[in-house]
Amino acid sequence: MADPRPDPDELARRAAQVIADRTGIGEHDVAVVLGSGWLPAVAALGSPTTVLPQAELPGFVPPTAAGHAGELLSVPIGAHRVLVLAGRIHAYEGHDLRYVVHPVRAARAAGAQIMVLTNAAGGLRADLQVGQPVLISDHLNLTARSPLVGGEFVDLTDAYSPRLRELARQSDPQLAEGVYAGLPGPHYETPAEIRMLQTLGADLVGMSTVHETIAARAAGAEVLGVSLVTNLAAGITGEPLSHAEVLAAGAASATRMGALLADVIARF
């Protein structure tokens, strides 16, 4: 039986056309996805020329997690026209992965050759501190799922662009790097699971980004991943974890994170 759902690429093209029509911009060359806790950083990126509810775009599903606005902004940064996705949906909200990665595919269809994927993450390394931005050097997809269907054998050797990471370090030479472990959520990890992740080589842990990275690379875009350490992972401090803690850490770091993103994007 034929799949009655729209073709993902066609749906992305439809969304891209609406974005172009509503913003008056034929192509946006950079896209930014703001993760949990990153929403307050929007103000530091610059003034948007257009703000669209994501629910008005073909294929987009409004996010339900706290700290995700569900808006798409068109923002000029330096010589670039940037699509800012203020909020993302997660697989743990019950969505098929084709909808989770649809915003990235739509941004690519709208012209974005660079995807800046941000997230909130738990820190697993002793040298990582709450409020610290960390460049993602690689990831562990521990969700047991892929957004790709069929014979799409995408090379992920440099899933997170070394070129873009070097540009980010030109903006802030103190930026650390780490391996991000993507888990399904929505529950936080147990201390035993954190010890397992450390053994596997993870430095950061969260519930997003890995599927978007795979979809972006499959579409031919470069990816820069940036985690904001919003808490130390389970068992490290002995304190319980909460989403409120994540949002508070993001709010406290908002100006710095927004300024960092704006400066890095201007260097692209």
From Swiss-Prot:
Keywords: Glycosyltransferase, Transferase. Phosphate binds at residues 36, 68, 88-90, 120, 208. It comes from the Bacteria. GO terms for biological process: deoxyguanosine catabolic process. GO terms for cellular component: cytoplasm. Pfam families: PNP_UDP_1. It catalyses: a purine 2'-deoxy-D-ribonucleoside + phosphate = a purine nucleobase + 2-deoxy-alpha-D-ribose 1-phosphate. InterPro entries: Nucleoside_phosphorylase_d, Nucleoside_phosphorylase_sf, PUNP, Purine_phosphorylase, Purine_phosphorylase-2_CS. CDD domains: PNP-EcPNPII_like (cd09009). A purine D-ribonucleoside binds at residues 189, 231. NCBIfam families: PNPH-PUNA-XAPA, PRK08202.1, PUNP. Homotrimer. Belongs to the PNP/MTAP phosphorylase family. The purine nucleoside phosphorylases catalyze the phosphorolytic breakdown of the N-glycosidic bond in the beta-(deoxy)ribonucleoside molecules, with the formation of the corresponding free purine bases and pentose-1-phosphate. Cleaves guanosine, inosine, 2'-deoxyguanosine and 2'-deoxyinosine. This is Purine nucleoside phosphorylase. It comes from Mycobacterium tuberculosis (strain ATCC 25618 / H37Rv). The lineage of its organism: Bacteria, Bacillati, Actinomycetota, Actinomycetes, Mycobacteriales.
